[in-house]
Amino acid sequence: MTDSHKIIAVVDDDPEMRAAMASLLSAYGYGAETFDSAQTFLTCASTSRATCLVVDIQLGDISGVELAHQLAADDFTYPIIFMAALDDEVIRNQAVAAGGIAFLHKPFPAQTLFDAIKKAVR
């Protein structure tokens, strides 16, 4: 599957961040699905074509870590890249324990994101 056929789901409650991530993903040849909340993604998870999730830790409804736990409980196995404005060791450890393959501290360089995505979708 080429990068242009790989869909990355972005779950972030910040509309500007979702738009920026979708634009960046498109510029690098990926498809993007964006979701404004964990609940919105959970509602669509069974029909999502995503090969990887990029999830903000601090969401308006449930946290990104809670989303990862819910997906695992529902037998969905997406590679998850977590991102957060705070670089907190406790949150980072929770993200890793929830199965996160990367934890990105906002703002992060585009190349850091794409290195994590390449690791996730190989």
Predicted feature descriptions by range:
Residues 90, 108-118:
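C-terminal output helix
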Residues 34-52:
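Acidic, metal-coordinating helix/loop segments flanking the phosphotransfer/catalytic sites
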